[in-house]
Amino acid sequence: MFALTAYRLRCAAWLLATGIFLLLAGCSEAKAPTALERVQKEGVLRVVTRNSPATYFQDRNGETGFEYELAKRFAERLGVELKIETADNLDDLYAQLSRAGGPALAAAGLTPGRQDDASVRYSHTYLDVTPQVIYRNGQQRPTRPEDLVGKRIMVLKGSSHAAQLAELKKQYPELKYDESDAVEVVDLLRMVDVGDIDLTLVDSNELAMNQVYFPNVRVAFDFGEARGLAWALPGGDDDSLMNEVNAFLDQAKKEGLLQRLKDRYYGHVDVLGYVGAYTFAQHLQQRLPRYESHFKQSGKQLDTDWRLLAAIGYQESLWQPSATSKTGVRGLMMLTNRTAQAMGVSNRLDPKQSIQGGSKYFVQIRSELPESIREPDRSWFALAAYNIGGAHLEDARKMAEKEGLNPNKWLDVKKMLPRLAQKRWYAKTRYGYARGGETVHFVQNVRRYYDILTWVTQPQMEGSQIAESGLHLPGVNKTRPDDDEGDGKL
């Protein structure tokens, strides 16, 4: 009897111990943090991306780029810091994303369509782009997919474009192409530009951001329908972070954040065209080095990015110190006599004085804008006022407010400026008629020149990298002695 009781007690103890163990194990498993909880606990959102003008790069003021700005807003939503990690190529990017303890997500202008997409998951899309076949101006233009046969083609290894070509090869077995993990989009466009390859495939947004550096490249045709860019997250069944990402992207689209970022980074990329791009590339090499030190000096004195000042100068005069217009404005920064006197400029044709005066005038205008206008919109408003005057700009802001738009956002106010040239609108304003449409183009052009200068002068683009890229970087390429300054008239 005693032995039986002891046996029962041992069994009960064993069952109790087993139950406690299973309970603890179950609690331990239940307490394993989700992907979202890990990010919040660490206080850091790790994001892997690519180094390119359409995604992420660093300039004098720090980190920037479309994907960087979007990821930064997402990190702010989560209440954590953003940590950017860069990948050498797409294969490296996806490898980092799939590795245990790797980044939380990839934000790199990705289009779903890779052959190994099963290893990752994609978010809702946030920007529509079109894959395009790129060729060199002067060569026979391909017009259909079968025209790719017999051409020297290179694309990014592991890209959706490589997957597209793999599908096309099933239809045309004789099609040949190379995939490379040692290049970026900039390199592929340069190779087409100089004739090292015949064709490449890139997305429309990548081309828009880079075409100005390579004026010989052209779009042959769209290679398929438009598709959306998305963020990539590691595979698995943990939806915590994915749900938060999708909610953020949906809200960003609904509340206008995506539109503002598109306007900032892509809203002004089509204003140059072939002739403008080719001419600007020449002037970067031949003219700007003569005046670069003056722009830098003014920028330092006025605590303003010298490249923005240089962009204004190019829009005004094409960096010609003797430029003159029919209205009497003169010099590299095209100052009126009244403005020159107010800024202490005694000789408008002296490039150093003109740059100092124009720069001082721009910064003064910017400082006088309402405090409710914040950067980067503040600089765009200042450019508009520099061109059209503060009074007319204020008319456009009031018009925007009456239309239910935001008078402190350039994206909204620029829609109103062309109305200042239409009687049914300007008749209701305080200051009357103005060529507001020209002002919109002025701001677009300056922004485009500024973007180019920002990219080609970023810190990592130095030395041999510049030579290899083929970009015309002021201060590096030598000025040609036979450069024609022109007759000084616009």
UniProtKB/Swiss-Prot annotation:
SMART domains (UniProt xref): PBPb (SM00062)
Bilayer topology annotation: Peripheral membrane protein
Q: What is its EC number?
A: 4.2.2.n1
Q: Where is the signal peptide?
A: 1-32
Q: Name one GO cellular component term.
A: cell outer membrane
For region LT domain, the annotated ranges are 270-490
Per UniProt, subcellular location reads as: Cell outer membrane
Q: Which domain of life is it from?
A: Bacteria
Q: Which SUPFAM superfamilies match?
A: Lysozyme-like, Periplasmic binding protein-like II
Checking Pfam families in the record gives: SBP_bac_3, SLT
Active-site positions on this chain: E316
Q: Does the keyword Zinc-finger apply?
A: no
The segments labelled Non-LT domain in the record are 33-269
UniProt GO MF annotations:
peptidoglycan lytic transglycosylase activity
Q: Which reaction does it catalyse?
A: Exolytic cleavage of the (1->4)-beta-glycosidic linkage between N-acetylmuramic acid (MurNAc) and N-acetylglucosamine (GlcNAc) residues in peptidoglycan, from either the reducing or the non-reducing ends of the peptidoglycan chains, with concomitant formation of a 1,6-anhydrobond in the MurNAc residue
Name the predominant localization. Answer: membrane
- Keyword terms, alphabetized: Cell outer membrane, Cell wall biogenesis/degradation, Lyase, Membrane, Signal
NCBIfam families to which the protein is assigned, alphabetical: PRK10859.1
This chain's function reads: Murein-degrading enzyme that degrades murein glycan strands and insoluble, high-molecular weight murein sacculi, with the concomitant formation of a 1,6-anhydromuramoyl product. Lytic transglycosylases (LTs) play an integral role in the metabolism of the peptidoglycan (PG) sacculus. Their lytic action creates space within the PG sacculus to allow for its expansion as well as for the insertion of various structures such as secretion systems and flagella.
The family classification in the record reads: In the N-terminal section; belongs to the bacterial solute-binding protein 3 family. In the C-terminal section; belongs to the transglycosylase Slt family.
Supply the domain comment: The N-terminal domain does not have lytic activity and probably modulates enzymatic activity. The C-terminal domain is the catalytic active domain.
What's this protein's name?
Membrane-bound lytic murein transglycosylase F
